[in-house]
Amino acid sequence: MFPRDVRIESYDPELAKAIAAETQRQEDHVELIASENYTSPAVMEAQGSQLTNKYAEGYPGKRYYGGCEYVDIAEQLAIDRLKQLFGADYANVQPHSGSQANQAVYFALLQPGDTILGMSLAHGGHLTHGAKVNASGKLFNAVQYGVNDQGLIDYDEVERLALEHKPKMVVAGFSAYSQVIDWARFRAIADKVGAYLFVDMAHVAGLVAAGVYPSPLEHAHVVTSTTHKTLRGPRGGIIVAKGADEDLVKKLQSIVFPGIQGGPLMHVIAGKAVAFKEALEPGFKAYQQQVVKNAQAMANTLIERGYKIVSGGTQNHLMLVDMIGKDVSGKDAEAALGKAHITVNKNSVPNDPRSPFVTSGLRLGTPAVTTRGYVEQDCVDLANWIADVLDAPNDDAVIARVRDAVSAQCRKYPVYG
């Protein structure tokens, strides 16, 4: 029997110390990594529930274990809410991550050696869109498209590559692209060569759910996403589709289980259900609108301070700061800003002369600060402080001044009140 009063602090003080330190870091540092956000206490409560104890291989109403009547309720709630959120008629909430959701789509619809056409990681794509170091680039013949000199997706190049290589699947989506994607154009290109259109909307799923970014579900054969990032849920993955035929649905269902996964993480699925309910609330739309306003305020301020934003600005939650020609690398900029309690990530930019371990860019995003309550003026201030540090990355006095300002701002907007 486990006594209910045992806490991590008393049983495992070493781990408790690390958790406490991370909790304090999240309160004291401003979070600008575009793929990070804060979950609600309700989501965390679900993840910490006794649902973690339950094995539930299979799907609601069709399990390989007994005793699943209550976890069936949790998973069905997640499925129904997810369908409502995106106007989907198919939803799978079992993928453990966005990468595994993507893997499921590839394995369901392709054979090893088939050609896929995806966005280059160096130009804003994702590892799982055909990067050579990823399984998607090893198991499949991955052809990569990129952006033009203006930092925009070159749809003519995408079409030319599709006509030349005849991919079985066209992959649309990104990890570092700040403009609106023309999903209809991608579908037209895919149709020209008889390919599937697969969209990974992990970064913009929350914006799509709120109607502030175009939905790919009207155009794609299948769509995946993570459930954290702009959706503000637990870390996990989903697969959705609209108008999918029965054969496609069967392939997707059977590849997630038993194809690539065994038992689903029922406590995480419960957390997803909570997050989807939160995303259906009226306030979620206002939150996502503010995310975009904050990103635009930040990007415009950085441009005014002499920093180049790839594509010239942003229409979503993120921006990519191009520092080619600057004296500071992405790696050094990340470190200097970290000392000032501003958390960012270094990122390669198009035609980057530096290695991916050093880079000439920074990726910034506003989902987390917007969750804290930041509005445009706060992000203007933040962008000016970022520019101050980037202008003098080795000046301890500047870093100390910015750190003090950031600390005051964080106290004004606590993560958890």
Curated annotation (Swiss-Prot):
Pathway: One-carbon metabolism; tetrahydrofolate interconversion; Amino-acid biosynthesis; glycine biosynthesis; glycine from L-serine: step 1/1. It is found in: Cytoplasm. GO terms for biological process: glycine biosynthetic process from serine; tetrahydrofolate interconversion. GO terms for molecular function: glycine hydroxymethyltransferase activity; pyridoxal phosphate binding. Its cofactor is pyridoxal 5'-phosphate. It catalyses: (6R)-5,10-methylene-5,6,7,8-tetrahydrofolate + glycine + H2O = (6S)-5,6,7,8-tetrahydrofolate + L-serine. It comes from the Bacteria. The modification N6-(pyridoxal phosphate)lysine is found at K229. The record marks H228 as: Plays an important role in substrate specificity. The keyword Transferase applies. One of its GO terms (cellular component) is cytosol. Coiled coil: none annotated. Its EC number is 2.1.2.1. Keywords: Amino-acid biosynthesis, Cytoplasm, One-carbon metabolism, Pyridoxal phosphate, Transferase. Its main location: cytoplasm. (6S)-5,6,7,8-tetrahydrofolate binds at L121, G125, H126, L127, S355, P356, F357. Pfam families: SHMT (PF00464). The keyword Acetylation does not apply. InterPro entries: PyrdxlP-dep_Trfase, PyrdxlP-dep_Trfase_major, PyrdxlP-dep_Trfase_small, Ser_HO-MeTrfase, Ser_HO-MeTrfase-like, Ser_HO-MeTrfase_PLP_BS, SHMT-like_dom. Catalyzes the reversible interconversion of serine and glycine with tetrahydrofolate (THF) serving as the one-carbon carrier. This reaction serves as the major source of one-carbon groups required for the biosynthesis of purines, thymidylate, methionine, and other important biomolecules. Also exhibits THF-independent aldolase activity toward beta-hydroxyamino acids, producing glycine and aldehydes, via a retro-aldol mechanism. PANTHER family: SERINE HYDROXYMETHYLTRANSFERASE (PTHR11680:SF50). Homodimer. Belongs to the SHMT family. This is Serine hydroxymethyltransferase. The lineage of its organism: Bacteria, Pseudomonadati, Pseudomonadota, Gammaproteobacteria, Lysobacterales.
